[in-house]
């Protein structure tokens, strides 16, 4: 998928922008706070029907405006034109259209324009709790496996109901408890199986990307942890019932799964430098891109790289740019504050690219840089 052109009105600090993009590399240069991330967020919005940074839609309207509009004009991998429109007025329902036909459900649009975004917020995958790492698995697997998504929805419904029973001050209903536990176990076994299969296939690709970027300076790994590894999930959940009633929530199940992120034999959270952590996260997201491309039929995802070069040495920056400029990846959108070093790298790799300057919400193409 290629985003050929975008039109933006009143989105965050972007009052108006009409931009035509390179089918390969697009770089947005400017100081922090100028609107580079907002521009990438508008591209993200057209894929996921929401902002990557602010889930409250009305707050994404420019302060002086009463509405925002984002329109994207795409070309599929098969050369077919596609138009996506999003509009929101204050205190009104959001409109989302594909080729001028409005969606009945926004969820019908998800997956049509696959996209992977790498941003500073990804640091929470290492530094944060296990919920973010489970969400990472869920986002990838749910985009290509409907059975997984259905099982996850069933599991979460049963978990919510079981937790409500555990908290209830009324007489304990053992029969109803068993109903929810059996649903948790049957759905949870599907979730566990598919997460296990995903991680087993994902790890070699992830390690390959990390090895390339670091030039084999360090070894990395991912280890999947789940209560389901120690036996039948129903027995595990039932055995925890007494303790769960004391705590008021479910302590065992796939909702407690985790990914252990390792540098060598140790947790990267404890041992990794800022540069190693950043490299680890970028390799994770590039592997996610590769996985979605393989499982998504004939659609190449868009790749957004927001301020990813901070904390990386010049060598690793060059390795990453060379990698994503290759044929394995499609259209790329990059933000950076350092115009000079990025321009030198891009000229070295001899691929088509455009450079845009972003200042106080105004975006202008710098043709003289893209020689």
Swiss-Prot record:
Protein task: The RecF protein is involved in DNA metabolism; it is required for DNA replication and normal SOS inducibility. RecF binds preferentially to single-stranded, linear DNA. It also seems to bind ATP.
Protein name: DNA replication and repair protein RecF
Keywords, in A-Z order: ATP-binding, Cytoplasm, DNA damage, DNA repair, DNA replication, DNA-binding, Nucleotide-binding, SOS response
Cited InterPro entries: DNA-binding_RecF, DNA-binding_RecF_CS, P-loop_NTPase, RecF/RecN/SMC_N, RecF_2
SUPFAM superfamilies given in the database record: P-loop containing nucleoside triphosphate hydrolases
Major location category of this protein: cytoplasm
Keyword DNA damage: yes
Subcellular location: Cytoplasm
Organism: Phocaeicola vulgatus (strain ATCC 8482 / DSM 1447 / JCM 5826 / CCUG 4940 / NBRC 14291 / NCTC 11154) (Bacteroides vulgatus)
Annotated ATP binding sites: 30-37
Any matching Pfam family: SMC_N
Protein encoded by which gene: recF
